[in-house]
């Protein structure tokens, strides 16, 4: 079974480097391999909006690879239909990263195309993605208004020409995403879960989790992403379909996840969006770690979708440690209360389950 590495922090560059060191990525890559890095540059927005991959993920990945002696490195991507890839690249600072490390960036909107037979139908895929010896997928874990979640598998859609992207939507997204994952399987996935959007692919409601993941199975990574977001696999049907078509496995056992450190606080975070402010109006946060707070926000959002009534007052954060609490507490720091959700951090589904019990 594949292993997932999980790390918390605020520096995307060093977190990426540490993940790759821990996983001994250099031993996975054949000598002289051509390595293609595929981030998420869906649109011309900065990563703090929750839509695109942080430039530090890219720089950390490149620096690790170059220090290990790999030189045939490129960055490949295309923005979504209607946006300009070069503009998106500059908005995220990728032009500066590529210039610093001497790595070329290829706009896949301008790439050659090859037709590949998939379990669904023939599909047009860009040649640079297909021909890479070692494809590294660098997605953002975030919500999506049509598929509930987007991460490793859906990020591969950026390896398609625009006309094929349009077909994906006319086909309903689910089956084509699964089919693509079975024929264009990345060798490595490094997930930017630093501040992914709550529910929209294009950003605007970022939730600070300060977390990153690394794995070698995109299906397993997406299944774990569902767990982190409080979603069931059934909520994101392309994941199990991709498993059926041979893209990977959804199985995750306890020893499949290596957590490299614990979440800590100490960063200055972007101001909460209007939606997040509304969701958390009854929350009293005192020195709450970002991962714990993000799990609560996600659970509050899911509760709203279900029409659940949530407590008028919820407490969360390190300053509640050792204190008697009469309200619902979130996380181990709030264990002084009669009613609290265990975990460091607790999962969104555990918090949501408590909301259901109290309704």
Task: Identify the residue ranges that each predicted region occupies.
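N-terminal and secondary-structure boundary signal
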Residues: 1-359
């Amino acid at each position: 079974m594949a292993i997932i590495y999980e790390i918390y922090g605020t520096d995307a560059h060093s977190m990426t480097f540490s993940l790759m060191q821990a996983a001994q990525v250099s031993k996975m890559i054949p000598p002289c391999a051509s390595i293609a890095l595929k981030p998420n540059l869906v649109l011309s927005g900065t990563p703090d909006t929750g839509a695109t991959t942080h430039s530090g993920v890219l720089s950390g990945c490149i620096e690790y690879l170059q220090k290990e002696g790999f030189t045939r490195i490129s960055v490949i991507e295309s923005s979504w239909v209607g946006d300009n890839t070069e503009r998106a690249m500059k908005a995220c600072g990728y032009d500066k990263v590529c210039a610093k490390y001497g790595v070329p960036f290829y706009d896949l909107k301008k790439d050659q195309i090859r037709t590949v037979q998939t379990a669904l139908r023939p599909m047009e895929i860009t040649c640079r993605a297909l021909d890479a010896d070692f494809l590294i997928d660098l997605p953002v874990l975030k919500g999506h208004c049509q598929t509930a979640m987007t991460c490793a598998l859906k990020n591969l859609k950026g390896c398609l020409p625009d006309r094929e992207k349009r077909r994906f939507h006319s086909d309903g997204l689910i089956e084509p995403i699964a089919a693509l994952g079975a024929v264009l399987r990345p060798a490595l996935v490094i997930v930017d879960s630093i501040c992914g959007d709550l529910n929209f692919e294009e950003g605007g409601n970022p939730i600070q989790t300060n977390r990153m993941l690394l794995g070698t199975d995109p299906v397993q990574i997406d299944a774990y992403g569902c767990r982190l977001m409080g979603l069931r696999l059934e909520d994101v049907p392309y994941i199990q379909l991709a498993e059926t078509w041979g893209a990977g496995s959804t199985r995750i056992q306890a020893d499949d996840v290596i957590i490299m450190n614990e979440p800590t606080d100490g960063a200055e975070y972007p101001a909460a969006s209007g939606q997040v402010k509304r969701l958390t109006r009854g929350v009293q946060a005192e020195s709450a770690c970002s991962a714990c707070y993000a799990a609560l926000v996600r659970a509050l959002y899911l509760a709203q979708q279900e029409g659940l009534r949530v407590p008028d007052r919820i407490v969360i954060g390190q300053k509640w440690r050792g204190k008697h609490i009469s309200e619902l507490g979130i996380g181990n720091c709030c264990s002084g209360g009669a009613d609290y959700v265990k975990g460091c951090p607790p999962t969104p589904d555990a918090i949501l389950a408590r909301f259901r019990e109290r309704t």
